[in-house]
Amino acid sequence: MLAQRTLKSLTKAVGVGLHSGQRVELTLRPAPPDSGIVFRRVDLPEPVDIVISPEAVTDTRLASTISSGSAKVHTVEHLMSACAGLGLDNLIIDITAEEVPILDGSASSFVFLLQSAGIALQDAPKRFVRILKPVEVREGEGANVKWARLSPYEGYKLSFEIDFDHPAVDSTGQRVEFDMGSGGYSRDIARARTFGFTKDVEMMRANGLALGGGLDNAIVMDDYKVLNSEGLRYNDEFVKHKILDAMGDLYLLGKPLLAAYSAFRSGHAMNNKLLRELQAHPEAYEIVTFDDEKSAPKGFSTLPRAW
């Protein structure tokens, strides 16, 4: 049986929120089978649980925010991407503020954190959402068009194309495809950092955003070049970060996908819209399990083994 996965033990991290600049503590705990991934705001007078789902997403400006009532957690996508890359199904995430810490601006610190806690197999089958028919969302026309699509595929692969009119971005790859079957998430995707432009930072900070951002947790560019002294981690780091984000946004479905995701100029809003469009068409998907893990698509049968 291809089994559900959780952590072997709890693990903790401390950091600051990218947009809030607030100090925040994370405690990641094992969770029972079929409980899913739950963010728990433990700083409130009464702790509030926020279970991940497309409907829990209430804001997609610059990041993905999930809510339950008035309780919110911002910028969940990098941690969710790490959970997707490691195949974690069940997890309780205690958080002491309303934004996940940015750490180094990628998912690699979360991957290290989760792997250091160890991964435990559980006595319940892993449930996948297998796409049976294409589902697409699209906005704009001509030069302003953007779209995202899920298509049938016996595995999980993502392709993304960006279109930034900037010298530093133009000189890198603007299209990339990643297949979970490669087993290379930690090596090829997780280290890609979020990025921004100095011309936007002042405006964002005036609006109370990017207060925790800097050269140690983002790629920062002026009108011509990357300002980080160490340069880029990948030649195509910008578009690889978009794949990283998409994996995190799509994992808010609550189950791993068996699908080919493709997108052009998509972002958090369109990724969430795509999940809601999928849910609106139950004939477009089915829930499947694998009694024999060897029959599972490559990339899931070969996820990092439990420690």
From Swiss-Prot:
GO molecular-function terms, A-Z: metal ion binding; UDP-3-O-acyl-N-acetylglucosamine deacetylase activity
Cofactor (UniProt): Zn(2+)
Protein name: UDP-3-O-acyl-N-acetylglucosamine deacetylase
InterPro entries, per database record: Ribosomal_Su5_D2-typ_SF (IPR020568), UDP-acyl_GlcNac_deAcase (IPR004463), UDP-acyl_GlcNac_deAcase_C (IPR011334), UDP-acyl_N-AcGlcN_deAcase_N (IPR015870)
Key word DNA-binding present: no
Organism: Polaromonas naphthalenivorans (strain CJ2)
This protein's pathway: Glycolipid biosynthesis; lipid IV(A) biosynthesis; lipid IV(A) from (3R)-3-hydroxytetradecanoyl-[acyl-carrier-protein] and UDP-N-acetyl-alpha-D-glucosamine: step 2/6
Catalytically driven reaction(s): a UDP-3-O-[(3R)-3-hydroxyacyl]-N-acetyl-alpha-D-glucosamine + H2O = a UDP-3-O-[(3R)-3-hydroxyacyl]-alpha-D-glucosamine + acetate
Gene field: lpxC
Cystine connections: none
